[in-house]
């Protein structure tokens, strides 16, 4: 980034290998069912699609002061809070995730009119969805690699957890999933984002369960239906945690009708958090 270049010029430092521990928020995004795009699109079509998608997403990332770590195919790996320190790195990462999802709605709308361009893949392209995961904590950041060829990147347990948030979001029917650490840090900066509690999960390699949340959007953008959905869902979670399966089912059924993402309505969506919790309640009822 231009800020990083300015910082290097001012300090007079040459880039060199090495890392330091820094408080950051790690950000991972991944296109849902990307292998389908690879199989069905021509190589040129795939490159065109990815370039348009990655340009749109990276523009948002940079506008929100994120640092691009790398692209891995369709995936974006980024960090907030390094190399330029930021007090609001958690908030900026969540804000980026929400803005990316909003931008993808616009892209799907645009692609839905480009039937000639995408041919037999038109239906697939116009249903593209992205999952995003974020986690906040201390990571090792710096230049890593070979002596003559290295990359500014991040490493550590908290980075792995951010990646797990992204991949694990699928199990909850969510398209953004963040840790409680990120939620709390984000709210300390600015409390204008709505969140819903999803679950506590024990991640492989960790002993303690981590609370996971879905940012559902900016409060100012939420319609009454979505607000009611979040209220019903929260009541469902409260009853679920008390093992009141019937009470929880009742609330999740109400929330399901109000979900902002519905299969058959929202392109590319096959389930949502309410549907996942309904299934889980039914399993608990049958296997007390």
Which residues make up each language-model segment?
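Serine endopeptidase catalytic core focused on the charge-relay Asp
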Residues: 100
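Regulatory cytosolic signal-relay segments
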Residues: 1-21, 105, 110, 267-268
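A generic structural signal for short hydrophobic patches within well-formed alpha-helices
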Residues: 5, 34, 182-183
């Amino acid at each position: 980034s231009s800020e990083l270049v300015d910082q290097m010029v001012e300090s007079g430092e040459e880039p060199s290998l090495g890392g330091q521990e820094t408080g950051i928020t790690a950000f991972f995004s991944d296109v849902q069912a990307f292998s389908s795009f690879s199989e069905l699109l021509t190589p040129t079509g795939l490159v065109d699609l990815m370039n348009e998608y990655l340009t749109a997403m990276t523009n948002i990332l940079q506008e929100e002061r994120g640092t691009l770590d790398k692209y891995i195919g369709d995936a974006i790996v980024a960090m907030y809070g390094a190399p330029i320190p930021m007090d609001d790195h958690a908030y900026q990462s969540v804000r980026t995730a929400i803005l990316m999802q909003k931008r993808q709605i616009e892209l799907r709308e645009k692609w839905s009119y480009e039937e000639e361009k995408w041919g037999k893949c038109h239906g697939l392209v116009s249903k593209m969805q992205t999952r995003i995961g974020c986690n906040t904590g201390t990571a090792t950041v710096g230049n890593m690699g070979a002596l003559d060829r290295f990359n500014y990147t991040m490493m550590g347990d908290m980075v792995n957890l951010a990646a797990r948030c992204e991949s694990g979001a699928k199990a909850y029917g969510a398209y953004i999933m963040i840790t409680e650490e990120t939620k709390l840090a984000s709210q300390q900066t600015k409390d204008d984002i709505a969140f819903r509690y999803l679950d506590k999960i024990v991640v492989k390699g960790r002993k303690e369960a981590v609370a996971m949340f879905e940012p559902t959007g900016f409060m100012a953008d939420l319609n009454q239906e979505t607000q009611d959905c979040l209220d019903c869902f929260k009541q469902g979670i409260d009853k679920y945690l008390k093992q009141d399966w019937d009470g929880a089912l009742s609330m999740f059924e109400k929330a399901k009708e109000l979900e902002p993402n519905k299969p058959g309505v929202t392109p590319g969506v096959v389930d949502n958090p309410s549907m996942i919790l309904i299934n889980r309640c039914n399993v608990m009822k049958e296997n007390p």
